[in-house]
Amino acid sequence: MDRYCVFGNPIGHSKSPLIHRLFAEQTGQALAYEAQLAPLDDFAGFARRFFEQGKGANVTVPFKEEAYRLVDELSERATRAGAVNTLVRLDGGRLRGDNTDGAGLLRDLTVNAGVQLRDRRVLLLGAGGAVRGVLAPFLGERPAQLLVANRTAEKAVALAGEFADLGAVRGCGFADVEGPFDLIVNGTSASLAGDVPPLAESVIERGRTVCYDMMYAKEATAFNRWAAERGAARTLDGLGMLVEQAAEAFFLWRGVRPASAPVLETLRRQLATG
């Protein structure tokens, strides 16, 4: 049976084995998928040993940049993202690295939530790997404005500059953000600590702005609570992004695109009762 896994450290919390088991059952694909706790000091060796038999893998924190350096070839979106979250074993044992995070977020927004980016004003919060991974897909949708804001303005400006060839994007510090926006995506990890980036309330237009937090939890995240209190039209969390990036990886491995909606529903139900 073909073997797949997710590499991470820590990894016990991962929902990927459940997601891919549900995808496999739904599509009739015979495969085994497990979580692998990779050592912090030898990810490359650990991954290579898995791929002596393994066919593919997902990669989560803190190994996405190491996976980028490990592979023999990269997809264009992985090259742009500077990180790899999906590994595919090719004929002859070569490894190809891809990044499905941006595609997953975009699909969750446009297909699941019905949010369009074309000609919209979009604010991305943060300048780390999570935001880097979604910039190219977002710019491909041709928003009217794409602003990257970060606590350290220089990081946001530099990141925006790397993607300027793909469309109109600029960077600034949180204090320099002037709204309102049609869509605000929080790509910082502030919600994990119960915090919210320091933004002016004018970034949200009451009854119009959609707010999306890449984080998710049983209850609304700190960012989504903040947004709802200020009249955001809708608040969305990152559980759909998790399922959609997994569906894209499954498609890369098996050539079959699973239906994500029933899997997302199962996870949402499990999260609410867990």
Curated annotation (Swiss-Prot):
Taxonomy of the source species: Bacteria, Pseudomonadati, Pseudomonadota, Gammaproteobacteria, Pseudomonadales
Q: Which GO terms describe its cellular component?
A: cytosol
Q: What does it catalyze?
A: shikimate + NADP(+) = 3-dehydroshikimate + NADPH + H(+)
What residues bind shikimate, as annotated? Answer: S14, K15, S16, T60, N85, D101, Y216
Q: Where is the active site?
A: K64 (proton acceptor)
Instruction: State whether keyword Iron-sulfur applies.
Output: no
Q: Name the Gene Ontology molecular function terms of this record.
A: NADP binding; shikimate 3-dehydrogenase (NADP+) activity
Pathway field: Metabolic intermediate biosynthesis; chorismate biosynthesis; chorismate from D-erythrose 4-phosphate and phosphoenolpyruvate: step 4/7
State its role. Answer: Involved in the biosynthesis of the chorismate, which leads to the biosynthesis of aromatic amino acids. Catalyzes the reversible NADPH linked reduction of 3-dehydroshikimate (DHSA) to yield shikimate (SA).
Sorted alphabetically, the keyword list is: Amino-acid biosynthesis, Aromatic amino acid biosynthesis, NADP, Oxidoreductase
Q: What is its EC number?
A: 1.1.1.25
Q: Of which family is this protein a member?
A: Belongs to the shikimate dehydrogenase family.
Q: Which Pfam families does the entry link to? A: SDH_C (PF18317), Shikimate_DH (PF01488), Shikimate_dh_N (PF08501)
Q: How does it assemble?
A: Homodimer.
Protein name (database record): Shikimate dehydrogenase (NADP(+))
Q: What processes does the entry annotate via GO biological process terms?
A: amino acid biosynthetic process; aromatic amino acid family biosynthetic process; chorismate biosynthetic process; shikimate metabolic process
Report TM segments.
none
Q: Which NCBIfam families match?
A: aroE (TIGR00507), PRK00258.1-2 (NF001310)
Q: Does the keyword Transmembrane apply?
A: no
Q: Where does NADP(+) bind?
A: E76, G126, A127, G128, G129, A130, N150, R151, T152, A153, E154, K155, M214, G238
